[in-house]
Amino acid sequence: MVRRSALLWCVLILALFAVSAGCMSAPATPSPATPAMTASPATTAAAAHASVADQLASVKSDNLVWKSAYRMFSTMKSTEYVHPPYTVDEANGTYKFDCLGFADHALMDADMAAYTAIGKGANPSIETYAAYFSRLSTTTPDAAGWTKVAHPVDLAPGDICLWLKPGTLDTGHMWIITGTPAINPKRSDEALVRILDSTGTPHSDDSRTGAADRTGLGSGILGMMVDSGGNPIGLYWEGGTSTGAGEKDTTIVCGRLSK
């Protein structure tokens, strides 16, 4: 009995370590709908990536977080979704991190003071980001230049968003906005927006779908479920195609750095 108990404790500790090391790669209950392909996978993947790259290249924004995130994407040669320790080699275009690692590196490169303000000098967790963003004003920037964006339709390139379920082992997810949100004409409770993130599960119209590096840094369409007041209440992981929303009972909050 003692040996069996010890084994169970070891398994539990390893499981706790795995989920606490970084963000989850996708919500717990995604409901994807896979479109039929009419061309070869390689041709389709190359065309999709080129289309996404063109969309990102056309973004007009002076936001420092956006510029930092886009620089990583545009210079990327190799990427992978991994928990710490991360590998970030800008000279060779290698980016291996999870969603938190991506957001951290983009923000540190954009404005180190704004990054350190969140964790008060320590490396922030997703919970730390959530607590910090939740306290922000939606109108007046704090000393570090941060405001909260309350409604998904008001998001802009460079805004940082996250979801998590406090008090659970679910470590949530983080992403950076890269486009202008638009309400799905077929589903009025869904704000569709292009994002950059690091994940193991691509979104819709995603640069990682069929690519050589299918996990890690990339861009796709996320759907943010909103209530009648425009507040975020859930996520459609594959924006516009997921048949149902997940993460309905979680914290979903976004912050904007204005400098």
Predicted regions located by residue number:
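...with weaker cross-activation on analogous glycine-rich loops/strands in unrelated enzymes
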Residues: 118-204
